[in-house]
């Protein structure tokens, strides 16, 4: 995590503020979505997915794997990918803070850093808190979307 943070912060230093803001928001949204996927995989009803698989719904078989392996899926999506997204968003925020400070040298760095940390926390934690009820309510649909994505990737990258 430390080396990833250092590497990404170095990369982020070379990106303009106009590009780093959308990239920052993309990383935050990706973290929120992966957290929702982890929650949905633990909540999804195996019977509903099994019913879709018996009707040959594309991606349902793959979705079944995600539901049956929910503890591992949740661990990867919530913990691993979520932590990586948090680290990346923090690194991007620090890079943006220093860029803003270079544009406005009279602004207090402590104030600017506190504001940056607050924004990162509010967007990340708040976004996850707001998205979790949706993920719980639409667990089967979310897992099916994940299964369809897995199905498509498998078809595109299968060996011939």
Explain the meaning of each model-derived region.
Residues 1-160:
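Membrane-embedded alpha-helical segments of inner-membrane proteins
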